[in-house]
Every structure is written in C-alpha cells, then in structure tokens.
Regions:
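Charged, amphipathic alpha-helical coiled-coil/dimerization segments
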Residues: 19, 69-129
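N-terminal leader segment of winged-helix/HTH proteins
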Residues: 1-29
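The alpha-helix within a helix-turn-helix
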Residues: 54
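C-terminal regulatory/oligomerization modules of transcriptional regulators
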Residues: 1, 121-146
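Pre-recognition alpha-helix immediately N-terminal to the DNA-recognition helix
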Residues: 37-40, 99
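Short, locally clustered residues in the helix-turn-helix/winged-helix DNA-binding domain
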Residues: 12-15, 40-44, 105
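Short capping segments at the starts of secondary-structure elements
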Residues: 45-49
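Residues within helix-turn-helix
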Residues: 50-51, 62, 69, 89
Length: 146
C-alpha cells in the first residue's frame, strides 16, 4: 500500500467512525443522518430552496424530493411558494421541526465536543488546518472537473 492509499484509508475510516457515531445518535430521535442534516440546513437558512438544499447535501434533486416528502409527512418541514416566483419553493421548519432540531442539535454539539476533545488543542488545530487545505483542494478539483 502506498502512502497516499494509506492516507486515503485513514480519512475514509475517520469518516466512517464519525458517521457511525452520528447515525447511532440520530437514530435515538428517529432521524437518519440525511434527515438530521436537512433539518439542520433548513434551520440555519429558513426559506432555503430544495435545489440549494440538494447542493449543500451533495445529492440529486430526486433524493431531496423524497427526503422532504418524508420530513413533511412527519410534520417537521413545510414548503411555501416563493413570494415573487411561483416556480420556486421555500423550505421552513415547523414548530415541531424546530423543537426536534434544537433538541438533537444540542445533544449533537455535546457529542462533537466529547469526540473532538480526545485530541489535544495542538492536534486539533493542526488537523483543522490540514483539513481546511484538503477540502479547498477537493472543491477546486471538483469545480474544474464539472
């Protein structure tokens, strides 16, 4: 295995461990990771369009449509027609969705602190700097490749 393959495996394993922890946490609230992050993006950007949500979540519009239908059916999300352009929908959390997001978000923040608290401040800062650089490079490569 080359050094780059090993590095990729480390990054992937880190993602899988983080994702597994998140899935386990969110399942206690009846949420998948996707459902939580949809709620989280809408909570942070009330009036967000489904198209923008699909960009933020790196998934296609048909997946977002299914995800939103489920969140609407559960009473967490509502859609409103844009005031000036009836072709555009805007997404908002309902009171029930706001309560759920607030509760899960608070628990998730504590969970993040516990997990990242395993690193020293120096290691945490170094990892943040390295990941910022890596994410910028990936985003640039993505935009160059279409």
């Amino acid at each position: 295995m080359t050094g780059r393959e090993h590095l990729y495996d480390l990054i992937k394993e880190s993602f899988l461990l983080l994702d597994f922890g998140d899935r386990t946490l969110f399942e206690r609230y009846g949420l998948s990771v996707s459902r939580y992050y949809a709620l989280h993006h809408i909570a942070g950007n009330p009036g967000l369009s489904p198209s923008r949500l699909s960009q933020l979540m790196f998934c296609d519009k048909s997946n977002i449509t299914r995800l939103l239908q489920g969140l609407e059916a559960d009473g967490y999300v509502t859609r409103h027609v844009h005031e000036r352009d009836a072709r555009i929908q805007r997404l908002f959390l309902t009171d029930k969705g706001l309560r759920l997001h607030r509760e899960v978000w608070t628990v998730h923040l504590t969970f993040i602190e516990q997990r990242l608290g395993l690193l020293s401040s120096e290691d945490s800062q170094q990892l943040e700097t390295t990941l910022d650089c890596f994410i910028r490079a990936l985003a640039e490569a993505r935009s160059l490749n279409g």
